[in-house]
Structure formats: C-alpha cells, structure tokens
Amino acid sequence: MAKGEGHILAQNKKARHDYHIVETVEAGIVLTGTEIKSVRAARIQLKDGFAQIKNGEAWLVNVHIAPFEQGNIWNADPERTRKLLLKKREITHLANELKGSGMTLAPLKVYLKDGFAKVLIGLAKGKHEYDKRETIKRRDQERDIKKQMKHYNAR
C-alpha cells in the first residue's frame, strides 16, 4: 500500500443506521505503545463509543481497544478516555454545533494514515424509528432494482 492511503481497521456501521451524519472530521488519537499495536491488529470496537468536548479539548469515550497480548504490565485500561488531536478552530466549530441542538459526535471509522491512527468523527443527529425503517426500505428497493437490472441485462 502506498504511503498516505488509509487502511480501515474498524467501522461503526450502527452509527450510520442510528444517526443522520451532518459532517465528518478527521482526528488523530493519542495512544500508548501497546494500544497502537492492538489498533494495528484491528482489535478495536467503536460500537458504543462517542466523542465529547471538555475544557476546549476533544475526547474519545467508550471505545474498546483490546489489551495487547504481549503487553503484560504496560497495557492500559481498554475503556479509558483517549484524547483526540484536532485544531482549535475545529474544536470550537464542533462545540458550537453541539450546543443545545440535539447533536452528538460519533466515531465512524478508525484507519491508519501515514502510519498514524486516525478516527473519522461524524457530527450526527439522532434518527427516529420511522427514519430507520425508511432507510432499510429504500436500501431493499435499491437492491431489488439492481437485481432486476442484472437479470434484464443478462438476456
């Protein structure tokens, strides 16, 4: 793989199902040595994770990074809060968007870029139950149309 290309290590498919993603931001993650080894081995779960902004800093919360098998005493807590590396203007922009608007920050995927672990954070607004059903219905219709077009073109 060429330098600069992202190698996706984990995705949060549930986030796109549960939220409308308004905008996305790429952020670096502050990790310990054994954590980055676990991340490179794709032993990370984003399912229950979210990001929050406290005291002008962005933090990644509830993201599980499995302990590194050979790490023994140097392994950190798998559920610890990890700092996100964002520019000050990005943090203030996200903080302003989050104020009283029913929005949240959800991690969408973790990948390697130029050897560094990056997380794609989505500014998200929660979906209602009927929105989720509508999304599933639309996806099924598109799948059926593709199937019929494939069958039609095969003749």
Swiss-Prot record:
Q: Which UniProt keywords apply?
A: Cytoplasm, RNA-binding
Kindly list the GO CC terms recorded for this protein.
cytosol
The answer to keyword Heme applying to this record is: no
Feature: compositional bias, Basic and acidic residues: 135-147
Q: Name one GO biological process term.
A: trans-translation
Q: Which domain of life is it from?
A: Bacteria
Under the GO molecular function aspect, what terms does this record hold?
A: RNA binding
Pfam families in alphabetical order: SmpB
Q: What is its main location?
A: cytoplasm
- Quote the subcellular location field of this record: Cytoplasm
Report disulfide bridges, numbered on this chain. none
Ranges for the region named Disordered are 135-155
* InterPro entries listed in its UniProt record: SmpB, SsrA-bd_prot, SsrA-bd_prot_CS
Question: What family is it from?
Answer: Belongs to the SmpB family.
Q: What PANTHER family does UniProt report for this protein, alphabetically? A: SSRA-BINDING PROTEIN, TMRNA-BINDING COMPONENT OF TRANS-TRANSLATION TAGGING COMPLEX
Functional note = Required for rescue of stalled ribosomes mediated by trans-translation. Binds to transfer-messenger RNA (tmRNA), required for stable association of tmRNA with ribosomes. tmRNA and SmpB together mimic tRNA shape, replacing the anticodon stem-loop with SmpB. tmRNA is encoded by the ssrA gene; the 2 termini fold to resemble tRNA(Ala) and it encodes a 'tag peptide', a short internal open reading frame. During trans-translation Ala-aminoacylated tmRNA acts like a tRNA, entering the A-site of stalled ribosomes, displacing the stalled mRNA.
For this entry, the protein name equals SsrA-binding protein
- Organism name: Streptococcus pyogenes serotype M12 (strain MGAS2096)
Q: Which gene encodes it?
A: smpB
